[in-house]
Amino acid sequence: MTNIRKTHPLLKIVNHSLIDLPXPSNISAWWNFGSLLGLCLVIQILTGLFLAMHYTSDTLTAFSSVTHICRDVNYGWLIRYLHANGASMFFICLYMHVGRGIYYGSYTYLETWNIGIILLFAVMATAFMGYVLPWGQMSFWGATVITNLLSAIPYIGTTLVEWIWGGFSVDKATLTRFFAFHFILPFIIAALVMVHLLFLHETGSNNPSGIPSNSDKIPFHPYYTIKDALGFLVLILLLLLLVLFSPDLLGDPDNYTPANPLNTPPHIKPEWYFLFAYAILRSIPNKLGGVLALIMSILVLAIIPFLHISKQRSMMFRPISQVLFWVLVADLLTLTWIGGQPVEHPFITIGQVASILYFSIILILMPLASLIENKILKW
């Protein structure tokens, strides 16, 4: 008799996705981040659900409801900090996952890559709206500054901003709708993840060499289930270290002050995972130009597959491209640092140079490097 996992309509899907899936035999730890992102999403949805049971999305009580969660709810402090730092782990995994995709040429799976970009935008939007919910100073002013950027859109800008606000400033209507969107988006993300995996399983996984691995496949279970389990343990360990020893390490002290529309904080800045994009936004003196650069800093990922002119898929055997890739990583770290600095000399100049370098590497230098490497190999 055939095993039930191969015949049952529901179990069959699970079997083909997680058990009998043929996977390349040589994928490294860089391929762990997909499953780690899945774990992060589950952690965020579960902790978020329990937070929503005690949170009130009203300007008068939002801040105190978060305080109540931390002080009075059983293990409320743990749930709250798991959720806040879980977002940081989520973005660390996201950036590693995207970096892996760029390094090993996984972006040639166009559908998977493009849905990944949509997922990135969705997660960023969710994180932004979640940051507004505690209704601290940085929540309020962050929401004001970022939503205000839409007013740079010609003709309809101002109307659009007031429509999003639900009034003439960030207020109760804004907070309530942000809570509603913050609650629903993770489930939309979960659905998109299914589509992401559907397209990935059409082609199968890429591998470090970038060479098709059809002749050498191994079953997902037990090889990659045990490997993913190890990744889960490492991620949970790091998350717990953060939550239990320094839960406020990555947060902003200003957010422990209740929102006050009459008092602007000296330095308005987003969470660390948005600082690179914020630095790019600030490096352009023009409002509309800055907004376009901000959007392009992520949307540029969609252009990468069309700039792939190398005869090799992966960067594994391409030293010039490798150097450029790591310069890009260093550049993003520089932008992250600049995003958290005040707008003054020399930070302005460093930010502008780093922003130009960011787009130059992706749009000009990497394709050039590929050309040179092709020439060297007489291809």
Curated annotation (Swiss-Prot):
Q: Which residues bind heme b b566?
A: 97, 196
A biological process from GO:
mitochondrial electron transport, ubiquinol to cytochrome c
Which Pfam families does the entry mention? Cytochrom_B_C, Cytochrome_B
Topology of the protein relative to the lipid bilayer: Multi-pass membrane protein
Cofactor binding annotation: Binds 2 heme b groups non-covalently.
Record text on subunit structure and interactions: The cytochrome bc1 complex contains 11 subunits: 3 respiratory subunits (MT-CYB, CYC1 and UQCRFS1), 2 core proteins (UQCRC1 and UQCRC2) and 6 low-molecular weight proteins (UQCRH/QCR6, UQCRB/QCR7, UQCRQ/QCR8, UQCR10/QCR9, UQCR11/QCR10 and a cleavage product of UQCRFS1). This cytochrome bc1 complex then forms a dimer.
Q: What is this protein called?
A: Cytochrome b
Q: Species name for this entry?
A: Sylvilagus obscurus (Appalachian cottontail)
